[in-house]
Amino acid sequence: MSFYNHKEIEPKWQKYWADHHTFKTGTDASKPKFYALDMFPYPSGAGLHVGHPEGYTATDILSRFKRAQGYNVLHPMGWDAFGLPAEQYAMDTGNDPADFTAENIANFKRQINALGFSYDWDREINTTDPNYYKWTQWIFTKLYEKGLAYEAEVPVNWVEELGTAIANEEVLPDGTSERGGYPVVRKPMRQWMLKITAYAERLLNDLDELDWPESIKDMQRNWIGKSTGANVTFKVKGTDKEFTVFTTRPDTLFGATFTVLAPEHDLVDAITSPEQAEAVANYKHQASLKSDLARTDLAKEKTGVWTGAYAINPVNGREIPIWIADYVLASYGTGAVMAVPAHDERDWEFAKQFGLPIVEVLEGGNVEEAAYTEDGPHVNSDFLNGLNKEEAIAKIVAWLEEKGFGQEKITYRLRDWLFSRQRYWGEPIPIIHWEDGTSTAVPESELPLVLPVTKDIRPSGTGESPLANLTDWLEVTREDGVKGRRETNTMPQWAGSSWYYLRYIDPHNTEKLADEDLLKQWLPVDIYVGGAEHAVLHLLYARFWHKFLYDLGVVPTKEPFQKLFNQGMILGTSYRDHRGALVATDKVEKRDGSFFHVETGEELEQAPAKMSKSLKNVVNPDDVVEQYGADTLRVYEMFMGPLDASIAWSEEGLEGSRKFLDRVYRLITSKEIVAENNGGLDKVYNETVKSVTEQIELMKFNTAIAQLMVFVNAANKEDKLYVDYAKGFVQLIAPFAPHLAEELWQTLTATGESISYVAWPTWDESKLVEDEIEIVVQIKGKVRAKLMVAKDLSREELQEVALADEKVKAEIDGKEIVKVIAVPNKLVNIVVK
C-alpha cells in the first residue's frame, strides 16, 4: 500500500523553495497586498516547542492562500534577541551572549524551515544587529527631542547581592529575587521614562477602529484606565502645607473621615509629629520591602500608622487624621486618598481595624455592618442631600472650583513607561551626560551606538549597568574639550519589538527606518497572530511608538495592526494524585487503560496542563516531524479545534491526521485520473472549493480540513477521478500540507513548477443546487416507496413517475385509484379502494 514518504518529500521541496526563492515578496504594483505577521520569537536555548507552530501555521495558510489569489504577500520572520535569559546564561557560563544568541537563532531557523513555512528570508531581522538597532536608537533620539523621553527618580526593585535593579516580574511573592532568592528593596534611582501618558486618550479612542478580539481591547482599556473625577485640595492643620487627592466620587466628600498618604509621599516626614516619628520611620522601611503587587493585594490585612497630623476637610472644616498605609502607591494618582469608609470596602476595613469614624452619606445600606457601595440619595451632605450621583458630582465640582478647593480632572491608570535596564545585553541608550550638567542625544550620523564587546558583563555594583565598567567606551570628550559620560543603562527588550514590523517592509535601507512609499504600500499589517499574553504591554508599546512615528510623518497610518488574532494554547498531558498535585510523566505508567504512580502505585487522574519542563510533558516539534512529517503536524494543529481555543495535545489525533494525508496521497497516486467528467463529484467538489475558501478567510481552519475530508471520502467511492477536480483539490490542500501538495501537483502536471502561484480554484454556484430530490409515495396514508426524481417536476410529471414505479405498481395492482395528490418536491399520495 502506498503512503506519503515525508522523509524524502519534505526536504526535497524545502530545498526547491530555498533554491528558487519561491516566497520572495511580490512587488507587482498592480496587485493587492497582504501583510501577514507573526509575533517574532525570543530565540531561547530550548528551541521551538509545538505551541509556536500553531500561530505560524495559521499565518502561513493565509499567506499561501493569498499568493494563489494573486496578492503580493509580505510574510516575514525575525528574532527578538535581546533580553535577560541570554545575559543570565552568559554570566553563568562565561560565554558571550551574542554567540549564544546566534546558536539559538540557527537552531530556531532550522526548526522553522523543517515545518515548511513560506517566509521571505531575505527580510529576516534581528533586534541585536547594529544595522537594526540603529533605528531603535534613532526613534529614542526623536522621543528625546520631543520631550517624550526623560529622566526621573523612580522607586525600583533593588537587589544588593546582584548589584542591579530587577523588573516587577522577577520579584517572587515572598519579596525575594527569582534569581538567587535575595532580598529585594524598593529604592529610588535615576531611570529613563517614556511619556506614553501623552498618548493615553488616542490609545484609548483608536481601539474602536480595530478588528481585534473584544477581550484584548477591554484589557487595554482597563490598563489605560481613564477615570473622570476631581482633584481636591486638603490643607494640613497648623501648617502652610497642603496635598491633593484625586477622587472619582467627590460627591462623597462629606463622608471623608480620614486621609491616607503613600509611605513615600513627599509630605510624610514634614508633617509627622515627634511622638509618631519612630513608628512612621519603621512603617516606611517595611513598606519599601514589598512589591507594588503585594501592597495592593485586596485580600491582605490592612496595616497603617497615624502621622500625628490632621487635614481639614474642605466641605465641612472638620479635622480628619492623616495616616500612611502601604496600599496607597506614590506612583498611582497623587499618592494620597480621601477615605470614605461608609462606601468603600477597603476604607471600611481600615476604619474598623483602627477605630476610625464611619459616616453614611449615601442612603440604602447598614454601614455599621458593611460598606454600602451601591448608589442612593445623598444624606448627611448639606447642600447635596437628596441628590442622585450625577447631580451631586456636578454640584460639588462646581462648588470646589468656585471656592478654590479643587477642579474637575481626568486621570489615567496608565503610568509612563520605565524604559531603562541596568543590564548589558540591550540597546545602548544614545545619550551623553556632560560635566557641565547638560545631556545631548548622539547625532544620527554617529548611530548606531554599538554595544561594546566585553567579557565582563557582571553588574557594576553601583546601580549602573556593566557598561559603567568599560572606561574606554564610557568616557567621551567634545570638540571644545568638555568631558562627558555615555548613558550606561540599556533599553528593555520591549524596545526592538515595538517597531520591528516596519523594518520588514524595507530591511536593508541604510538611509532611513523604511522608505515612505513602501510603508504606504504595505501598512497596516493585515493580520497579526500571537499569544494573548502580549495583550497589554507589547501591543500598547507598539501602538504608542507607531502613533509617535505617525506624528513625525514617518508612517502613513494611525494604527499598526488592523486585525489581531490570538491563538489558543496547546496543553500537554499531565497527571494528578488524590491531593491534586501534578506528577511528572516519567513517574507514570499505564495499565489496562488507567494511569498509576510508578513509586506509590496510586491511581492518577489524567488532565491537560500547560507544557513544562518540570512535568516532562513538552513535545518537541523535531520529534513529530521525524516520525510523522511536518505536513502532519501542520494539519493536526489546525484540525485540533478552533484556532483560538486551548486544547490538549493528543498522539491519537496526530496519527489520525497522518492517516488522512496517506489517504490523500493514495487518492491522487492510485486512482485512475481521467480527462472526462462524469459529473459524479460535481456537487461535492464545488461545495469543497466554496467551503474551504470561505473558512480560510474566517480562519476556521478546522472546518476547512473537515470539508477536505468529506471530498476524499466521496472521491474514494468513485471509480475514476476527473483531472480538473484532482488538481483543484490538491490546490485546496496546499496551504495546509504544502510539501505533499507540491509532490502531488507534479504527479498531475509534471510541469516542474511550484504550485505556490497557481491561481486558486473557483466554484460553479449552479453545481451546488440540488438537481435531484427524494420524494415519498404514500398509499392509503402509509409510506410505500421513496423515489429520487428530477427537481421541480410538475404535478402531472410527478404523478406519472410515481405510478410507473415497480414497487408502487405492485402495491396498487388490482385496486381502483380514487385520487392522486402530488406535491412537487415533497410527496405523492395515492388514494385507492
UniProtKB/Swiss-Prot annotation:
Question: Keyword set for this entry?
Answer: Aminoacyl-tRNA synthetase, ATP-binding, Cytoplasm, Ligase, Nucleotide-binding, Protein biosynthesis
Identify the residues that bind ATP: K613
Q: Where is this motif: 'KMSKS' region?
A: 610-614
Broadest EC class assigned to this enzyme:
ligase
Q: Does the keyword Hydrolase apply?
A: no
Q: Where is this motif: 'HIGH' region?
A: 41-52
- List the CDD domains: Anticodon_Ia_Leu_BEm, LeuRS_core
InterPro entries, per database record:
aa-tRNA-synth_I_CS, aa-tRNA-synth_Ia, Leu-tRNA-ligase, Leu_tRNA-synth_edit, M/V/L/I-tRNA-synth_anticd-bd, Methionyl/Leucyl_tRNA_Synth, Rossmann-like_a/b/a_fold, tRNAsynth_Ia_anticodon-bd
User: Which reactions are catalysed by this chain?
Assistant: tRNA(Leu) + L-leucine + ATP = L-leucyl-tRNA(Leu) + AMP + diphosphate
Give the chief site where it resides.
Answer: cytoplasm
Where located? Cytoplasm
Q: Which domain of life is it from?
A: Bacteria
Q: One GO BP annotation here?
A: leucyl-tRNA aminoacylation
Give the EC number(s) under which this enzyme is classified: 6.1.1.4
One cellular component term (GO) for this entry is: cytosol
Q: What's the short name of a Pfam family annotated to this entry?
A: tRNA-synt_1g
What the entry lists under Gene3D superfamilies is as follows: HUPs, Isoleucyl-tRNA Synthetase, Domain 1, Valyl/Leucyl/Isoleucyl-tRNA synthetase, editing domain
Report the GO molecular function annotations: aminoacyl-tRNA deacylase activity; ATP binding; leucine-tRNA ligase activity
Q: Which family does it belong to?
A: Belongs to the class-I aminoacyl-tRNA synthetase family.
Q: What is this protein called?
A: Leucine--tRNA ligase
Organism, as annotated = Streptococcus thermophilus (strain ATCC BAA-250 / LMG 18311)
Gene name per UniProt: leuS
